[in-house]
Amino acid sequence: MPSASKNFRLQSKYVFLTYPKCSSQRDDLFQFLWEKLTPFLIFFLGVASELHQDGTTHYHALIQLDKKPCIRDPSFFDFEGNHPNIQPARNSKQVLDYISKDGDIKTRGDFRDHKVSPRKSDARWRTIIQTATSKEEYLDMIKEEFPHEWATKLQWLEYSANKLFPPQPEQYVSPFTESDLRCHEDLHNWRETHLYHVSIDAYTFIHPVSYDQAQSDLEWMADLTRMREGLGSDTPASTSADQLVPERPPGLEVSGDTTTGTGPSTSPTTMNTPPIISSTTSPSSSSHCGSN
């Protein structure tokens, strides 16, 4: 049984009740309602049963009174431990058609074809919603038609306005000019000198070597590129993870009188021989100092 509520109040001559999963008898419920509502001068009462999909029985009741009640007790219509859903019947004809669809209905009295007309304020609100073309116009129309609501419920009205007229995202305008975003020359030179165009991780995907070896390979390629192009050590070199890696000139295999070591070769043969370019050989797989 529901607890008493200070907010409950029923003031309608036309009432629609639904008793869900009710094990009572229909005729007993009908008699209970008739006796309970007699002081309000019953004009019509109809009670119908409905077999629900889960096998339980629902009871519906349409009540039409000649005298408007003022019921504050939410348990007023409770019957044998069953509490109904209570709501005003705004269209009695629709309610009667609904509850009598299964044909099992008991009635008493003269039915009134009653229908509650929409309030004039609802029509005014509908006009505002349908005719406003922007958020500003919507709020201005409400301010004109319903000044009290505008003054006391502006926060909720702005919320509904944003739902009707979603704000368009503003186009981003960068606070920086194009010249501000250009790389300064000293930073550009530092980047080209100290940073590779390919990361060490990307290099190891193509050349299966260790991290340290990959770093050494990239440094060697950068130095070699500068040397071949006659550039200084502070001049940027182009490196790529999948570029062709030059083999280091072999040692004794080139010439019988070639001197090996870290110093430059004095053999005319090796000095005039161009570097051998290989797509499969990396610095990590060839000797950095030649053959011993």
Swiss-Prot record:
Cofactor(s) this protein cannot do without: Mg(2+); Mn(2+)
- Consequence recorded when altering C183S: 50% loss of ability to bind RBR
Alphabetically ordered keywords of this record: Activator, Covalent protein-DNA linkage, DNA replication, DNA-binding, Endonuclease, G1/S host cell cycle checkpoint dysregulation by virus, Host cytoplasm, Host nucleus, Host-virus interaction, Hydrolase, Metal-binding, Modulation of host cell cycle by virus, Nuclease, Nucleotide-binding, Nucleotidyltransferase, Repressor, Transferase
Q: Where is this motif: RCR-2?
A: 58-60
Instruction: Identify the enzyme class.
Output: hydrolase
Summarize the impact of F205Y. Answer: In strain: Mild
Residues annotated for a divalent metal cation binding in this entry: E50, H58, H60, D102
All copies of domain CRESS-DNA virus Rep endonuclease, residue ranges: 9-111
Q: Where does the motif RCR-1 lie? A: 16-19
Q: Which residues does the entry assign to the active site, renumbered to this chain?
A: Y98 (for dna cleavage activity)
Q: What is the effect of changing L181I?
A: 20% loss of ability to bind RBR
Functional summary from the UniProt entry:
Implicated in enhancement of V-sense gene expression. Acts a an inhibitor of C-sense gene transcription.
The molecule here is called Replication-associated protein A
Organism field: Bean yellow dwarf virus
